[in-house]
Amino acid sequence: MNWPDYSLEEAALRSGARFVAGVDEVGRGPLAGPVTAAAVILDAGCIPEGLNDSKKLTAKRREALAELVMARCDWAVGHASVEEIDRLNILRASHLAMCRAIAGLRQRPCLVLVDGNMLPRDLDLPGQAVVGGDARCLSIAAASILAKLLRDRIMVDLAQQHPGYGWEANAGYPTPAHRQALLDLGVTPYHRRSFAPVHKILCKEETATR
């Protein structure tokens, strides 16, 4: 298995950057819930061992690493709501969540390493897009772990308010069971109306009431 490393952060620090943040988001694909981003500035002297892309970790390992990151590092989380996703589109909402996470850091980064191939439009700091960053860069890997864990917790809470959709297990992603629940139970306030499977159901409901 290839592991992320600290080389991008080290290069920036050698070039004079004082603080380098890694940023990642989770929740672009779900039919329900917010999109969540995290920003992390690692302390080079005490980087938690075992950081990796959150998708490659078990839930137990993810939680243990998240606790270490939150205890040792400067970190923050940002969200964009379902309403913002529907109004802006999912890409812009993801970037909004990233900017909110960066703004929540105690220290202002000199450089932001962003997972993906595009920097947020409203980023007011120097940034570098890193394709596959959660598997390449330790700061981004740490951010991916926090974003995943904290969004999953939100979806567990929402599942208690709206049982039957399986959000505690599927985190709002379009599993067959979630799609069937949409047909059987209908659309909740936490479903993304701009996403095709939800939009189609709403259109059918509107047609049926005419």
From Swiss-Prot:
Enzyme Commission (EC) number: 3.1.26.4
Keyword flag Repeat: no
Cofactor binding summary note: Manganese or magnesium. Binds 1 divalent metal ion per monomer in the absence of substrate. May bind a second metal ion after substrate binding.
Catalytic activity: Endonucleolytic cleavage to 5'-phosphomonoester
Any one GO biological process: mismatch repair
Record protein name field: Ribonuclease HII
CDD domains per the UniProt record, alphabetical: RNase_HII_bacteria_HII_like
Superkingdom of the source species: Bacteria
Positions bound to a divalent metal cation: D24, E25, D115
Taxonomic path: Bacteria, Pseudomonadati, Pseudomonadota, Alphaproteobacteria, Rhodobacterales
Alphabetic keyword roster: Cytoplasm, Endonuclease, Hydrolase, Manganese, Metal-binding, Nuclease
A GO cellular-component term linked to this record: ribonuclease H2 complex
